[in-house]
Amino acid sequence: MKKLFLACLMLLGAIQSWATGQEADIIYLYGEKWMLLGRPLDNVRDVKARLSLALPEARTKSTANPDGIVCIWSVQGTHLQLDSVAVIVGENKLTYPALGLKDPFDKYINKDHISASWVNGQLRAARGKQLYYEHTGYNRNYASEIFLTFKNGKMTDMKTFNNNVRTEGFDLTNGKVMQALQDGMDTKEYSELKGSSVLARISDMDINKSGELKDCKVRIIMRKNGYSTELTNHPLEKRVKNALKNLSPWRTLYINGNVIIPHSTFTFPITVE
């Protein structure tokens, strides 16, 4: 029965989809506290399942933290180790030294610590002002970020980035943008659109250093009688582009060595009159 329960826990973890922003773990890098935007324990699901059984069943869980577990890690020298595990029970935060939870981590005990020797690849740590956020997974960025590369738990590379806002302004989720697009769309002259619903799909936005839109890709999709049709080279494409170009400046960010445009892909409905 216990094996079956462990298997169920592993399966639930495997099919979990991050449909909301996820709570970060914590990592100490040479004494400094950072958010760890990832969950190294997800790569050892048998360990994670046993850990779940070893912790209080009444711990608080949420869509942002379905397991109700926050792990505290550190890099000692060049080696990643798991120091402790924290949970919330009622109004109390309980922290358990990882070494005291011997059963889940028996394969990774190295003298006086838990060696995260299963960790391979890249982890991202962050702190400071949040510059960008999407309500899914760890799709967010901060003023300071570090990319750590590991091989069998040993750090082989570390890259540090200082991020900032390049231009402040609009993005496609802004209500004023939505209103400007609706105001700029006169559909009365397009008889082929009557009785249908129409969507404009915007992507590939090209914005210059001043925050002005140079170009973008617009697709017009008409749905009528249960069928969807892309209207190639429809005049509405140009109208949407012009409406967007009349808005300035657009918000752009300098993130981890690249210029990005927040929410640069978006679909919005066009009201058909």
Where are these regions (language model features)?
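An exposed acidic His-Trp-rich patch
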Residues: 83-141, 180-184
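Short, positively biased Gly/Pro-containing turn/loop motifs at secondary-structure boundaries
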Residues: 229-273
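Short loop/turn motifs at secondary-structure junctions and domain boundaries
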Residues: 64-65, 192-199
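Bacterial Sec-dependent N-terminal signal peptides
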Residues: 1-23
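Acidic, low-complexity proline/glycine/alanine-rich linker and hinge segments
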Residues: 154-194, 231-248
